[in-house]
């Protein structure tokens, strides 16, 4: 006997490889040129900027003393994918929660932009070291809509597993093995428990360990103090880099701003607030300021000290997305009839997002070997990232925020 | 009049005799300068986080004007000049602190291209400093003067005493003989990075300027008299004391007219 209410588990550990193209059968999509696609991608970047900041502020609201780390691109694409299988309020809430203005951007353009973005991030020749994967875990008696399944496989590169959720330990193991394998062992036990009546689960993961264009010398790394707060100090390995870097002081944010380029068209923006100005920074930061930071390069002589760290994020997306207006998909009124053929309503009973990032000294060998330039001899400002700071990692072409993080205690994983 | 002439002569003689180096034991590879050996040397400092930080050296050329490097003042910070300074972290009793009122960088200076040259700026002070044994004007060379190769020169400053090391607390000096333009611009040295509007000195792999020395003077002896022939500008990104990568200075004698015009019109 099929349960009267089907429960869906959504596990978001990261980035969707591909957003399905528009599913409507009666609309024939014509190919657009690369040139036309680029503005659409920027549309998405603009929207994801607002989305990323809204999400960040919600996380700060939940706890302002914890590390924060998440992937706006990953969360947005997963929900955009779900929107293709949802209808009514469930559908509308998702797109508006992701902060798309549906009077300015057509839904077809939204999905096209996501597709283009994901193609950019997952180019085979990219030097970016992003690891992403997608798994659909379906109860062995549930039948998925063929169209949705096809799109998930073709555009989402999803792997589909048939599992017996009645055997919850076995089902849990299948999901956890998938994520652990895809993240090279970095994310274990992605799912700790499954609700008794779960029949549908989606797992995504994202792992990033980029190479700096301008690497740190490991010989310069030494132990130093990091001031978590006024009364707490921890010891961390502090990397050091001196040279012509993109650094400036932003009086609007009351922060020093550092840009570091990764190989593969990604950049990290580090924001180091002056003492007592973290809350000001968090309240003042907006996508216009970030765009200016990315576009206006200001190389100058500087010496930076930044912790070597591994940071991960693990969030309950129901708690996180509800304040953004995405509520229907999580309750009994959810309409996910585009995903399952069953008459019984499907519900997202649990959604978890996980992401992992390593920041260390590693750079591209060639870049290190060929560095030669004249260096002015003013005493460089010394920026010590020895108290809580923010960072945002962008895909350069689209300015899409791949990751947003706040380091409060670098010794916490 | 005669009394003045005698005084000036005494100052010059004293300057010459006191500057004969005893040993150069450790700027990079330099040694602590004797107090008031280089009375035209200043410390340029910027305000940040409620305190002042040394960033560059400079040369007092008028009682209310300082010559330094343009890259020293690229950032819009609040700057001050300290004259009569010896120990940055102690009260020597001889210091005078004065705010920078106006900054005039060379119009052709491009902060993204230090090897193009023009790395020179003049700072007008908010008030004139008092000249004494510890505070003097730097002597500048005649316009167009070109140093002979291997001329005896000293770089002075509070710059790092080791690549990526700490600032010196007391004023340092290092003997850096000049390197002619033809040698310095050869491919085994700096190549085309060095221009004729620059002066090179050092390059033995031991002694050099380093971060914190920028803007400060290169004192060279010509015809028995020291003059400030260089404004400290850049070193190699591979490190401060790299063999065949002499410390590079803006050549002061190329900018005499420009400086005179700036001072006259400001």
UniProtKB/Swiss-Prot annotation, chain A:
<comment type="similarity">
    <text>Belongs to the serpin family.</text>
</comment>
<feature type="region of interest" description="RCL">
    <location>
        <begin position="368"/>
        <end position="387"/>
    </location>
</feature>
<keyword id="KW-0722">Serine protease inhibitor</keyword>
<dbReference type="GO" id="GO:0006487">
    <property type="term" value="P:protein N-linked glycosylation"/>
</dbReference>
<dbReference type="InterPro" id="IPR023796">
    <property type="entry name" value="Serpin_dom"/>
</dbReference>
<feature type="glycosylation site" description="N-linked (GlcNAc...) asparagine">
    <location>
        <position position="265"/>
    </location>
</feature>
<feature type="glycosylation site" description="N-linked (GlcNAc...) asparagine">
    <location>
        <position position="101"/>
    </location>
</feature>
<keyword id="KW-0325">Glycoprotein</keyword>
<dbReference type="InterPro" id="IPR000215">
    <property type="entry name" value="Serpin_fam"/>
</dbReference>
<feature type="signal peptide">
    <location>
        <begin position="1"/>
        <end position="24"/>
    </location>
</feature>
<dbReference type="GO" id="GO:0043434">
    <property type="term" value="P:response to peptide hormone"/>
</dbReference>
<keyword id="KW-0646">Protease inhibitor</keyword>
<dbReference type="GO" id="GO:0005615">
    <property type="term" value="C:extracellular space"/>
</dbReference>
<dbReference type="Pfam" id="PF00079">
    <property type="entry name" value="Serpin"/>
</dbReference>
<dbReference type="GO" id="GO:0004867">
    <property type="term" value="F:serine-type endopeptidase inhibitor activity"/>
</dbReference>
<dbReference type="InterPro" id="IPR042185">
    <property type="entry name" value="Serpin_sf_2"/>
</dbReference>
<dbReference type="InterPro" id="IPR036186">
    <property type="entry name" value="Serpin_sf"/>
</dbReference>
<keyword id="KW-0732">Signal</keyword>
<dbReference type="GO" id="GO:0006953">
    <property type="term" value="P:acute-phase response"/>
</dbReference>
<dbReference type="GO" id="GO:0001701">
    <property type="term" value="P:in utero embryonic development"/>
</dbReference>
<dbReference type="GO" id="GO:0034097">
    <property type="term" value="P:response to cytokine"/>
</dbReference>
<dbReference type="GO" id="GO:0005576">
    <property type="term" value="C:extracellular region"/>
</dbReference>
From Swiss-Prot, chain B:
<dbReference type="GO" id="GO:0016055">
    <property type="term" value="P:Wnt signaling pathway"/>
</dbReference>
<dbReference type="InterPro" id="IPR018114">
    <property type="entry name" value="TRYPSIN_HIS"/>
</dbReference>
<dbReference type="GO" id="GO:0055123">
    <property type="term" value="P:digestive system development"/>
</dbReference>
<keyword id="KW-0325">Glycoprotein</keyword>
<feature type="binding site">
    <location>
        <position position="95"/>
    </location>
    <ligand>
        <name>Ca(2+)</name>
    </ligand>
</feature>
<keyword id="KW-0865">Zymogen</keyword>
<feature type="active site" description="Charge relay system">
    <location>
        <position position="71"/>
    </location>
</feature>
<feature type="domain" description="Peptidase S1">
    <location>
        <begin position="27"/>
        <end position="264"/>
    </location>
</feature>
<keyword id="KW-0106">Calcium</keyword>
<feature type="active site" description="Charge relay system">
    <location>
        <position position="119"/>
    </location>
</feature>
<dbReference type="GO" id="GO:0006954">
    <property type="term" value="P:inflammatory response"/>
</dbReference>
<dbReference type="Pfam" id="PF00089">
    <property type="entry name" value="Trypsin"/>
</dbReference>
<dbReference type="GO" id="GO:0004252">
    <property type="term" value="F:serine-type endopeptidase activity"/>
</dbReference>
<feature type="propeptide" description="Activation peptide">
    <location>
        <begin position="17"/>
        <end position="26"/>
    </location>
</feature>
<feature type="disulfide bond">
    <location>
        <begin position="56"/>
        <end position="72"/>
    </location>
</feature>
<dbReference type="GO" id="GO:0000122">
    <property type="term" value="P:negative regulation of transcription by RNA polymerase II"/>
</dbReference>
<keyword id="KW-0479">Metal-binding</keyword>
<feature type="disulfide bond">
    <location>
        <begin position="184"/>
        <end position="200"/>
    </location>
</feature>
<dbReference type="GO" id="GO:0006366">
    <property type="term" value="P:transcription by RNA polymerase II"/>
</dbReference>
<dbReference type="GO" id="GO:0045595">
    <property type="term" value="P:regulation of cell differentiation"/>
</dbReference>
<dbReference type="InterPro" id="IPR050850">
    <property type="entry name" value="Peptidase_S1_Elastase_sf"/>
</dbReference>
<comment type="similarity">
    <text>Belongs to the peptidase S1 family. Elastase subfamily.</text>
</comment>
